Each structure stands twice: as C-alpha cells, then as structure tokens.
C-alpha cells in the first residue's frame, strides 16, 4: 500500500514535516471512519492521487489498443477491397471501367429459339427475320481486362449462334464493326449498355442490313446528363467511390432530317410526341430516359412512307437503338418479352409486320428464356 511504502522510507525528515504528515493521516482516518467509500490514499506532497488498488489506472489502455486494432483492420479491408478485380460477375479494369463477364450460353434455349424462328418463316414465307446481338465490352475490349481474368470466347459463342440459325434468318454482325471502332467510346464504363455513339453504329448496321435508307445529313448530339451512373456502379469497389468520377455523359444522336413521329404505349394507350423522358435523365435511373423505362409494348408511327412495319423483339439494350429507326420505317412495334406474354405470331397478324428484328445484348440472349415464350405458335 502507499502508506506502507511511505512509512518504510529511511530518509530522515524534519519534525515539522513529520507533524504535517501525522495530521494528514489523522484527518484521513476520521474521514474514513465516517464514510468508507473513499478510494484514494494520500502520499507525500509530490505524489498525486491514484485510483485505489490500481483497478482504474489501466482502463484507458485497452480502449486505445482496441482503436488501433480497428484502424488496422479497416486499413486491411480497404487494401483487400482496392486490390479486388472481380465482383459479382464484373471485372474492374485499370482505367476504372467495369466489364461484364461473358456468360455461358444456354444451349437448349438457343436451339429452341432457332427452331421457332424457322417455324415462323415456314408459316409466313414473306416475313423477313434478322438477329443482331450486341457483344459485351469484354468481348470487344479484352486488353482492358485484368491480367488474371480468364473469360469465355464470346466471339466463338456468337459465331456458333449464327451457324445454327436457319437460312431464312439473317445475321447482323457487330463484332467486326465494333472491333474496327474499339478505340471509340462504344460502351458505358459503369453499365452494359451502348453509349449514344455505340448505339448509332449499331442502328446504322441494322438499317443497312434490312435494306432501308440511312437518313441523310448530320446527326445532332444532345447531352441529357453528365452524371450517368449505371448498374455496375453498385458493384464497384466501395472504398474507391469517394475518389473516382461520379458519372458519365449520357448522350443521344438525332438525325437533322429525322422523320416526324408519335408513339403509343401498348398498355395505357397514352401517346407522346417524343421517345425520350427528359425528367428521367436527371434521376437515379437515368437510362429510363429511353421510352420512360422498360415498356411491354410500344407503337411508333412515322411520316416515312414505305409500307414497312418493323417488329423489334429485344431487351433493354435495344432501348437506345430503336429510336434511331424512326426515319427508316413507316411503323415500328417494340416489344420487351420479359414484360408481356404476347407472341410474335399474334403481333405479325395484328400489325401486318414485314420485318422482325431480334435485338439483344449478347449475354441476355445467351440465357434469357422469355424469348421462347414470345416465339411460341
């Protein structure tokens, strides 16, 4: 105890000092007899009060050590997070972009889809069918993938799909076209969809393949948003969201001599003089700027008189491409099979369809079976 240690000191002290110490001891004894809850003992003038028994003296040390451990653990997780290159099927590239892993094809689905297309051709021999699949960015830009990435050869998968199509169905190739323009911004860095520029290339390829005229004159570029953040941003490395760009440019290209048109929502029957929803461009779901979101069925009627009615069966990849068809077809019917059970055969009869375009992102076409329901007869 502190008292015992002090009493054992052999160094002589003056009488006055000794008396003062005795008086302090007496005062302490009196206070202790009245209230025995005191936890402090008095030593010499130079020694400060200390917690009794030392039970509280080290209480701050464990908290300090805990803070150090938490900081070290957080830094370790952050380092692991930063070094991660693959997350939820998405590769993070050195330039900050996100590339989706090519999916394994559903062989049965692909075979059944090709068979249904052939059956449709036999039922409607004058109906022209086309398939255009947009390859993933990883397929076109493999050099941007991390060195450790091992992905499927999607070019080979697409070639296999093409080889299994019936002769009555025409394939529209985008792999070579996009490879020739791989140095241009064809894809969003934070989403699987094509940019306005990439959509322009795809639309022109489809229009030419379907024997229609591309609008004359220049295309006008419109910036709808400069803070677009796609679905891949949700899977990017969280610790880097604070340090990297918060968005991309969302642009559309419109021909200067674009034909006049109006669209009708197949369910609500509401019509509009625009294919775009300007309010959506500034929302968290900016890609809904096209048609106001994913619609089951949309009718587009134009002033282009050529007796051609195009039926587009597709996924959301088609949303940014279809608007560029308005100057090349008199009527366009755009259907998302995931939103409606309507069949191609019924649509062909109802709208007197002359051409059918199956327009999908390659990954979606590889695995999405809703198309099979639409192709049923």
Regions found by a protein language model. Name each.
Residues 2-6, 10-377:
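Extracellular glycan-modifying ectodomains
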């Amino acid at each position: 105890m502190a008292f015992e240690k002090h009493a054992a000191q052999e160094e002589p002290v003056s009488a006055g000092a000794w008396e003062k110490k005795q008086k302090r001891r007496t005062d302490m004894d009196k206070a202790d007899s009245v209230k025995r809850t005191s936890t402090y003992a008095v030593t010499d003038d130079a020694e400060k009060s200390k917690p009794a028994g030392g039970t509280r003296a080290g209480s701050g040390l464990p908290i300090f050590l805990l803070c150090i451990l938490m900081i070290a653990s957080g830094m370790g997780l952050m380092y692991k997070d930063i070094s991660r290159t693959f997350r939820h099927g998405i590769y993070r590239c050195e330039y900050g972009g996100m590339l989706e892993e090519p999916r394994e094809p559903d062989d049965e689905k692909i075979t059944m889809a090709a068979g249904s297309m052939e059956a449709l051709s036999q039922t409607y021999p004058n109906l022209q069918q086309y398939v255009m699949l947009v390859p993933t960015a990883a397929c076109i830009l493999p050099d941007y993938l991390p060195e450790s990435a091992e992905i499927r050869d999607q070019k080979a998968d697409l070639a296999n799909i093409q080889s299994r199509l019936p002769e009555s169905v025409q394939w529209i190739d985008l792999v070579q076209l996009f490879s020739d323009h791989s140095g241009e911004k064809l894809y969003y860095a934070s989403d699987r969809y094509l940019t306005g520029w990439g959509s322009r290339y795809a639309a022109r390829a489809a229009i030419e393949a379907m024997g229609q005229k591309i609008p004359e004159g220049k295309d006008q570029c419109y910036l709808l948003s400069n803070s677009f953040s796609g679905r891949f941003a949700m899977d990017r490395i969280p610790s880097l969201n604070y340090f990297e760009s918060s968005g991309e440019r969302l642009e559309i290209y419109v021909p200067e001599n674009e034909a006049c048109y109006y669209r009708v929502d197949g369910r609500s029957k509401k019509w509009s003089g625009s294919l775009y929803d300007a309010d959506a461009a500034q929302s968290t779901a900016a890609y809904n700027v096209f048609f106001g979101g994913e619609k089951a069925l949309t009718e587009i009627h134009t002033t282009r008189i050529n007796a051609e009615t195009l039926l587009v069966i597709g996924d959301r990849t088609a949303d940014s491409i279809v608007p560029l068809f308005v100057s090349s077809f008199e009527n366009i019917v755009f259907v998302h099979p995931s939103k409606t059970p309507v069949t191609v055969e019924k649509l062909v009869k109802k709208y007197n369809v002359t051409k059918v375009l199956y327009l999908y992102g390659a990954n979606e076409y590889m695995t999405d079976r809703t198309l099979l329901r639409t192709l049923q007869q």
